[in-house]
Regions:
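Small-residue-enriched flexible segments
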Residues: 1-20, 26-30, 34, 39-199
């Protein structure tokens, strides 16, 4: 996964649940002191990697990484880490983005992040990983959001989003047996959700 990576300025790790902690430690050993974030999840390049590992390396950038702990109850307690990281990198909306990986409760995390990012008009991209674990700079966390401010030293950078879904009036679903804390839907229109999607 790291073949050809020689002098990275920032690294993103995507691994599987069984090997995540091992891959985090190996990445830190191979590239000590290089800012990194990681999570459990799939990755895509020319094919989909579900049970393996992928590493994305950045050059020509500066990166500052940190963590918001206690994501499930009070990520705002660690908001000063976001502020300090922004100051350290001297972020600008023209050349800096924020990338984050969360273990869950992303609604509270996003509210916390946006309370700072909106002031500077810094874009955010990222997601919630699987398995309840994320990493930053070689340390694995549970119940946390790891983030990186990535500043392009040679130009601009932007985050774009596209909604690939569109309204379809012939379908209406009533969700039940939901768990808001885990963002799960048990049933749609009285059928198991998995079955409803397959139909």
């Amino acid at each position: 996964a790291v073949r050809g990576i020689s002098n990275p300025a920032f690294l993103i790790l995507m691994s599987n649940a069984e090997q995540f902690e091992t891959h985090v430690a190996e990445l830190e050993e191979l590239y000590p002191g290089v800012p990194s974030i990681g999570c459990i999840g799939m990755s895509y390049q020319t094919s989909v990697t579900e049970k393996g590992v992928s590493v994305t390396a950045f050059e020509g950038v500066e990166a500052v990484t940190d963590v918001l702990e206690q994501a499930s109850i009070m990520p705002v307690k660690y908001i000063s880490r976001v502020e300090k990281a922004l100051q350290k990198i001297n972020a600008s909306s023209e050349n800096t983005v924020c990338i984050d990986f969360c273990t869950g409760n992303d609604a509270a995390v996003l509210t916390t992040m946006y309370s700072i990012l909106e002031k500077k008009k810094i874009s955010l991209t990222g997601g919630t990983g699987d398995g309840g674990k994320v990493s930053v700079n070689g340390t694995v966390y549970t119940d946390a959001d790891v983030f990186a401010f990535v500043k392009n030293n040679g130009g601009k950078v932007r985050v774009y989003k596209e909604n690939i879904y569109y309204p379809n009036p012939q379908y209406r679903f009533i969700a039940s047996k939901t768990d808001r804390s885990k963002y799960t839907v048990g049933e749609l229109n009285g059928k198991p959700a998995r079955q409803a999607y397959q139909d």
